[in-house]
Regions:
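Active-site neighborhood of HAD-like aspartate-dependent phosphohydrolases
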Residues: 25, 31-86, 90, 243
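A metal-dependent, Asp-based hydrolase signature
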Residues: 90-120
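Acidic, Mg2+-coordinating phosphoryl-transfer loop and its flanking beta/alpha structural elements
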Residues: 224-262
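Short acidic capping loops at alpha-helix termini that bridge into adjacent secondary structure
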Residues: 192-196, 224-227
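Conserved Lys-Pro-Asp/Glu-containing loop-to-beta segment of HAD-superfamily phosphomonoesterases
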Residues: 206-234
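Short, acidic loop-to-helix structural element flanking the phosphoryl-transfer center
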Residues: 48-51, 115-150, 154, 158-173, ...
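Generic structural signal for small/hydrophobic residues in well-ordered secondary structure
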Residues: 55-58, 95, 148, 197, ...
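N-terminal chloroplast transit peptides
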Residues: 1-24
Length: 276
């Protein structure tokens, strides 16, 4: 049985009464726009469409950088931004430098700081955005394919040693890769609901780089219209729309529920799911 996904009426998401703006297909041809259903690419007919791509920080998980980290350094956010290296964090998220190098160059003046203390501060600050875990659970129960699509760095937790031991035990690359997100995983177990598939520290690219979005489509082997991308950063949402990915600007979970429901996503909770 073919799986179909109804394309929403574009105008419905552009009205002022819309919960939050969606950005479907700005550069797609008219014949694609008028197609009433989205089909999977060859070899993917058993997948439930659309595939859901979630940003992590401040979409699913609270980002401690804006409040907890400045407090850790005894600064305001403005002061921290002014004295930190302008590109160090970006290079860290792209996997160009590791956390040791980050700690060396984080501040413009080269001052040292307690790296483990910073990591502990961030661990404490991680929590699910209100209502998000319940939504993820429902989507998972309803058989949607869900992937992380995020700008996120590699925080090592004795990873070099653990990776080596993992290789000796014959684990796959993806199993080793999973260890790299241990700081969030240990606390929130995000992988119960999605796969840590598309992360800047592994791909070497960051949103809103168009090539990052194209890499995602290539790896998933689906057309752009078979994906929905959710992110709290408007520039990332707009960049996804530029390559034809249906995109939602995350503001809060209630509005996201309305948007997903309006787009035909099954967010119903059946009775046997409630008993899980």
């Amino acid at each position: 049985m073919a799986l179909t996904f109804r394309v929403p009426n574009v105008s419905a998401f552009l009205l002022k009464s819309s919960p939050s703006p969606a950005y479907p297909y700005p550069k797609m041809s008219q014949n694609v726009r008028s197609n009433a259903s989205l089909s999977a690419s060859a070899g993917s007919t058993n997948r439930r469409l659309p595939i859901l791509l979630f940003d992590i920080m401040d979409t699913l998980v609270r980002d401690p950088f804006y409040h907890d980290v400045p407090a850790f350094f005894g600064m305001s956010l403005k002061e921290l931004i002014e004295c930190k290296h302008p590109t160090a964090w970006i290079e860290f998220e792209k996997g160009m430098i590791d956390e040791v190098e980050l700690s060396r160059i984080f501040f413009k003046d080269g001052r040292s700081f307690d790296l483990e203390g910073l990591k502990n501060c961030m661990r404490r600050g991680y929590s699910y955005i209100e209502g998000v875990e319940e939504l993820l659970h429902t989507l998972k129960q309803n058989k949607y394919e869900i992937h992380a699509f995020t700008n996120y760095p590699i925080w090592y937790d004795k990873i070099l040693f653990n990776d080596f031991i993992s290789i000796l035990r014959g684990l796959s690359f993806l199993e080793i890769l999973f260890c790299r997100y241990k700081m969030i995983e240990d606390k929130l177990k995000v992988s119960r609901y999605l796969s840590w598939t598309f992360c800047s520290c592994i791909n070497g690219k960051r949103k809103p780089d168009p090539d990052f979005y194209l890499d995602v489509l290539s790896q998933l082997e689906v057309n752009s219209e078979n994906c929905i991308f959710i992110d709290d950063r408007l520039k990332n949402v707009e960049a996804a729309a530029e390559v034809g990915i249906v995109s939602l600007h995350f503001k809060n979970t209630n509005l996201l529920l309305q948007d997903l429901s309006s787009m035909g996503i099954d967010i119903s909770v059946e009775e046997h799911h409630r008993q899980d």
